[in-house]
Regions:
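Phosphate/NTP-binding elements of NTP-utilizing enzymes
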Residues: 1-243
Length: 243
């Protein structure tokens, strides 16, 4: 993931639970702040407790660094923000209508974006704050189809936007195999398995159709043999009989 963060300005991650992504992103934020001047990094979380926990991870990394490596010193810190002597800062806030809107951001991180309240409106307000070259890392487990996060990720997979899609299933963890999966899923519903482990949009939300039904429909669905018309919106599954 770190190479993706460095090589792509916009990254969107669809992930399984408990892979350590939030911890990795916290470490990446510290690296950006220490080795580059005047970095303005904003993390948006689903609630205040999650935002404060992110800053605790940031502070843990800072405390574990040797003094010779921590060249810029910490000049201010509280439960939601850390500021460095080189002008960089890391701030974590809960979701709100005006979160980050008045700032020019170097890096925007949205944690569990599929569960962020009013993420559609929030993203519309935040995107302009990255116009001066800022980067974005949006990460989440799935939460059904139709929301802004789902749209951004699926468009990224189709290369219809600027995001680099990253999909991390449960088995990317080096200590998780089939035995772990079988044990972990014994007391989970199909929806929980789809959401927490399989990164399945369709089965993770409160959808009318089950995944089994969708799979059957996919098998029965046939692609048209020909398309025509000004906008290619006339589809043929069989050619008409000629008299």
């Amino acid at each position: 993931c770190v190479n993706d963060f460095n090589n792509n300005r916009f990254n969107i991650i669809l992930k399984s639970r408990q892979l350590g992504l939030s911890t990795l992103v916290a470490a990446y934020s510290v690296w950006q702040s220490i080795f580059y001047k005047e970095k303005n990094i904003l993390i948006i979380a689903t609630k205040l407790a999650v935002a404060q926990n992110f800053i605790r991870k940031v502070k843990t990394y800072i405390k574990s660094m040797p003094n010779w490596l921590l060249v810029p010193t910490v000049v201010a810190n509280n439960k939601q923000q850390v500021e460095f002597s080189n002008g960089s800062q890391i701030k974590a806030v809960p979701t709100s209508d005006d979160a980050g809107r008045s700032e020019a951001l170097s890096l925007l991180i949205v944690d569990e974006a599929a569960f962020v309240r009013n993420f559609d409106d929030l993203w519309m307000g935040l995107y302009p704050t990255l116009s001066t070259g800022g980067r974005a890392i949006i990460l989440s487990t799935p939460n059904g189809v139709g929301g802004q996060y789902h749209e951004l990720y699926t468009k990224a997979e189709r290369k219809e936007n600027k995001f680099n899609p990253i999909k991390l299933l449960w088995d990317v963890h080096p200590e998780r195999g089939d035995d772990w999966f079988e044990k972990e899923t014994k007391n989970m519903s199909k929806k929980q398995i789809s959401q927490e482990l399989l990164c399945d949009f369709a089965s993770s939300g409160d959808t009318f159709l089950t995944q089994d039904t969708l799979d059957k429909l996919r098998i029965l669905t046939k692609s048209p043999i020909e398309k025509s018309g000004p906008e290619m919106n006339v589809w043929y599954w069989e050619h008409p009989l000629r008299s």
